[in-house]
Amino acid sequence: ACTQNSHTMMGRSIVKETTLNEYLKNPKSGNEDFKLESYKGKVSPSELNLYQEWEPSVHFWNMSIDLSKCHGCGACVIACHAENNVPVVGKQEVRKNRDMHWLRVDRYYSSDMTKDLAEEKGIGAIEMYKMMEEPSSEESLEVVFQPVMCQHCNQAPCENVCPVAATTHSNEGLNQMTYNRCIGTRYCMNNCPYKVRRFNWFNYKDNDNFDFNMNDDLGKMVLNPDVTVRARGVMEKCSMCIQNIQKTKLDAKRERRKIRDGEVSCACETACDTGAIVFGDALDSNSRISKEKKHPRTYALLEELNTQPSVFYKTKVRNKNKVNKNV
């Protein structure tokens, strides 16, 4: 049972990387600004915006993920499950593409197949992508790990298609789920370009077929009381650990002070032993996340869609002579 190819975003500029030598010469190497062709010529996606402009109010929660620091240990995934009462569905459900993770770690291997090579040899798109999934030879094999969760887009495609407004946007930049309003159409899951939304096919917490951690008295004692246990037929996804955000806001209000930088943390950030994940308020100009956002290595996933994510990534820097363009 493997989810590696279930939610693939192959064929797009998902992972960006460069070498240390190139990075020292040019901090933006491997992370050139993306431009779209238009009647005005080449422009950035934000210049072709069809949405109404949105401005955050008091806070603007953002997350940064450094691909150079992530080594794919999976601690963030386990922490997310424990903190947010995400059910363990087992191998049989995973084989049916019914996996349940708010956060996944995508693994990309370097490949000898490229788009240019496929075009030269007359190989079709489906066959090309199949060949791209085959790793290159052991001598030149490279791997990249990339954590992917809900990107909390500020122009979210999922929000437009929900017929009951079960997924909405907060004034702090979070994409929110209202579970008791969701009727399970799965339109949002279908319209999400990042494939991060999950559907509850069963009532996992009281189902003997899923004898893992939610259907006995002892298992229910370790559930987080601050997080709703979802029922059958509703969608769920990363909430940026909203319960921790709200608790910190209440603590700061009680003490009549502002929230300090680093005071709010997500479960994945806390569990990451390399410090690859940084979370914070981007409206605080002195915060670490604000500095990460302005870093020349920073880029957004699927920038060409102009979803304006609140999660961004930093280019992977390899300490070698030449970068492999075929990851």
List the predicted regions and their residue ranges.
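Non-ligating segments of multi-cofactor redox enzymes
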Residues: 1-327
